[in-house]
Amino acid sequence: MGTRIDGKKVAARTKADLAKRVELLKARGIQPGLGTILVGSDPGSVKYVAGKHADCAEIGVNSIKRELPENATFDQVADAVRQLNADPACTGYIVQLPLPRGIDENAIIDLIDPKKDADGMHPYNLGELVLHARGDITTPLPCTPRGVIELLRAYDIDLDGKEVCVLGRGITIGRTIGLLLTRKAVNATVTLCHTGTKDVRDHMRRADVIVAAMGVAGFVKPEDIKEGSILVDVGVSRVFDEESGRYKVKGDVDKACYEKAFAYTPNPGGVGPMTRAMLLQNVVEMAERQL
């Protein structure tokens, strides 16, 4: 059985460190604040946003909430974005996605002040990541890709020269994690697989590391991986469990793979907690840049 990479434990350590940094900021007269814009009342989105504000309270970051009805117009959402751009109490903020049908999400994200982009997904910040493959980056980083890399570092997993197979081309991780993995400081070789990839399982068998972000429950099987590989499971699917009569969250990696792996992230309990921790880290770093 491979090593279980505990995202909850690493996230807790990260938040403890951030709490100390927030205290130092407060001593210098800077109070970090995280804003959220929530449109509608989707249960998943409501729960996720509530979790972010609970995290804020845990480390001493103020919460700024903007809630709009399901039938909010583009202009109303845009106004909420502009208000947070102008609010000095808001260090950084996120627009909870997805937005209701008919609202152009990319157009809304474009309106975010890049310096307050807590998710690290503004085109300017992604462009900075593309342009600067070496040295320090002083713009916010995408939370989930950053969380994956920090999680592996916490377990002393060196990615230098490793073959990494990324499954899925979604913007949250699939298309963005390669930008971090191929930076000189990480130095991995990345293959991005998607629905148009031929012989995807051949790519998986060659990989030292698989980052699964397809949202297809149990897609990665034991016969698809080589002995001693590292499995990072980011996929999320809600699957009905007949035994319990309830829906359960399932990852993209079949648990039978754990026997062959050198290390693996459980799902849930792996990458998810680190994504939330990296959101806080972005906000604290934004505040520290004000010093």
UniProtKB/Swiss-Prot annotation:
Q: Which GO terms describe its cellular component?
A: cytosol
| Listed name of the protein | Bifunctional protein FolD
Is DNA damage set as a keyword in this record? no
Q: Which UniProt keywords apply?
A: Amino-acid biosynthesis, Histidine biosynthesis, Hydrolase, Methionine biosynthesis, Multifunctional enzyme, NADP, One-carbon metabolism, Oxidoreductase, Purine biosynthesis
From the UniProt record, which GO molecular function terms apply? methenyltetrahydrofolate cyclohydrolase activity; methylenetetrahydrofolate dehydrogenase (NADP+) activity
Identify the EC number(s).
1.5.1.5, 3.5.4.9
Coiled-coil features, chain-numbered ranges:
none
So, what pathway does this thing act in?
A: One-carbon metabolism; tetrahydrofolate interconversion
Q: Which reaction does it catalyse?
A: (6R)-5,10-methylene-5,6,7,8-tetrahydrofolate + NADP(+) = (6R)-5,10-methenyltetrahydrofolate + NADPH; (6R)-5,10-methenyltetrahydrofolate + H2O = (6R)-10-formyltetrahydrofolate + H(+)
**Species of provenance:** Bifidobacterium adolescentis (strain ATCC 15703 / DSM 20083 / NCTC 11814 / E194a)
* Biological processes per GO annotation: L-histidine biosynthetic process; methionine biosynthetic process; purine nucleotide biosynthetic process; tetrahydrofolate interconversion
Q: Where is the signal peptide?
A: none
Residues binding NADP(+) are 168-170, 195, 236
InterPro entries per the UniProt record, alphabetical: Aminoacid_DH-like_N_sf, NAD(P)-bd_dom_sf, THF_DH/CycHdrlase, THF_DH/CycHdrlase_cat_dom, THF_DH/CycHdrlase_NAD-bd_dom
Q: Which CDD domains match?
A: NAD_bind_m-THF_DH_Cyclohyd
Function description:
Catalyzes the oxidation of 5,10-methylenetetrahydrofolate to 5,10-methenyltetrahydrofolate and then the hydrolysis of 5,10-methenyltetrahydrofolate to 10-formyltetrahydrofolate.
Belongs to which family?
Belongs to the tetrahydrofolate dehydrogenase/cyclohydrolase family.
